UniProtKB/Swiss-Prot annotation:
The active site is at C96 (nucleophile), C193 (cysteine persulfide intermediate). GO terms for biological process: tRNA wobble position uridine thiolation. Its EC number is 2.8.1.13. It comes from Bacteroides fragilis (strain YCH46). Catalyzes the 2-thiolation of uridine at the wobble position (U34) of tRNA, leading to the formation of s(2)U34. It is found in: Cytoplasm. It comes from the Bacteria. The keyword Transferase applies. It is an enzyme of class 2 (transferase). CDD domains: MnmA_TRMU-like. Its main location: cytoplasm. ATP binds at G11, M12, S13, G14, G15, T16, D17, S18, F37, G120. It holds the Pfam family tRNA_Me_trans. This is tRNA-specific 2-thiouridylase MnmA 1.
């Protein structure tokens, strides 16, 4: 078994959070090595690489760069596209953290003989009744626990999370107070790293640009389709079903005398059903690909909280396992716009119990 020494491998993005994490780990007496992953470079910019290298040099810590663009394309971006083509609403940041970023960090650390792993995530870790749990950050506005429900004990036991007890404003002040003015003023990243502004523009570029990478067979013809009401009556034409998500109201390109929202997406017919917000409420859902730290804390309990969106929509629920191996969630109060492909995360007593991917939901 690897010795638990004071060496730690830190994921460094070049941003404020991972930079401050490096400083905090050094102050705590750790020997820090930084690794910057090349996952995706928006508009081809590599400024983040130079920023991470420069910070590592200034702090006097080791630094390496790891090119993961191919695996990121295959596991994250292609999944993202495939999910929308299936009429689902993916959460790529959840998949990336649980199946790529943290496992890759562990793999590199193993090769270097390093036990501890760290990032600039705003989360905490707790040891309760023989298990490690992720816990929400002190800064509720920056808390990222929702994205980490898929991590297992072999990763959790190695994690160091120096940002969990700090707010973002405190992190900026901390960096500025130590002479890292540029670090303290870096902008926050917003949204998905490979399409931070609008996923529809990204999808259209991937799906509809015949001049794209034909070796990857990304180009797929997307034609206009029909908006229907709940009775199957034609309302208007739409641009193509992949460009809509469950619960969407804005950007439909139609004007009606009532508010309507996307209720159903049918890839096989290229039809999108619109309905009132009330009609989107559901009181049940099922999860696949789930991970739970300790099932006894979740199953049969009525005080579990489930979240289906980062920072939004939480409710109390009860959870059982179906004969098919899915998690069946019964909500105490209906939630609106539950979409297949989204993630759901469970919380209880201030701990992240686990989560899974929504595979289907029923009407109230």
């Amino acid at each position: 078994m690897m010795e638990k020494n004071k060496r730690v491998l830190l994921g460094m993005s070049g941003g404020t959070d991972s930079s401050v994490a490096a400083m905090l780990l050094l102050e705590a007496g750790y020997e820090v090595t930084g690794v910057t992953f090349r996952f995706y470079e928006f508009n081809g910019s590599t400024e983040y690489l130079e920023d991470a290298r420069a910070l590592a040099a200034r702090l006097g810590i080791g630094h390496i760069t790891y090119d993961a663009r191919k695996v990121f394309q295959e596991q994250i971006i292609d999944y993202f596209i495939d999910e929308y083509m299936s009429g689902h609403t993916p959460v790529p940041c959840t998949l990336c953290n649980n199946q790529l970023k943290w496992p890759l960090l562990a793999k590199i650390a193993d090769e270097m003989g390093i036990f501890y792993l760290a990032t600039g995530h705003y989360v905490r870790k707790q040891w309760v009744d023989g298990n490690y749990y992720i816990a929400p950050a002190e800064d509720v506005d920056k808390d990222q626990s929702f994205f980490l429900w898929g991590l297992r004990q072999e990763i959790l036991q190695r994690m160091l999370l120096p940002m969990g007890g700090m707010t973002k404003s405190e992190a900026r002040a901390y960096a500025a107070g130590r002479g890292f003015e540029k670090v303290s003023k870096k902008k926050d990243s917003i949204g998905v790293c490979f399409c931070p502004l609008d996923y529809r523009s990204f999808l259209k570029k991937c799906l509809c640009d015949e001049s794209g990478d034909k070796n990857r067979n990304i180009y797929r013809k997307v034609e206009r389709g029909r908006f229907l009401d709940e009775s199957g009556n034609f309302i208007a034409w739409h641009e193509g079903y992949p460009f809509y998500t469950i619960g969407q109201r804005r950007g439909l390109g139609i004007q009606l005398n009532r508010a309507v929202f996307v209720k159903e997406i049918h890839p096989e017919t290229n039809e999108v059903v619109l309905a009132s917000l009330k009609s989107l409420e559901k009181s049940e859902m099922w999860l696949k690909d789930w991970n739970i730290v300790d099932e006894s804390r979740l199953l049969g309990c009525d005080d579990v909280i489930v979240k289906i969106r980062y920072r939004k929509q939480e409710n109390h629920c009860s959870v059982t396992i179906t004969p098919e191996g899915l998690l069946h969630i019964r909500l105490h109060e209906p939630l609106s716009a539950i979409a297949e492909g989204q993630a759901a995360a469970f919380y209880k007593d201030g701990l992240l119990l686990g989560g899974g991917i929504i595979t289907m939901s029923d009407q109230r």
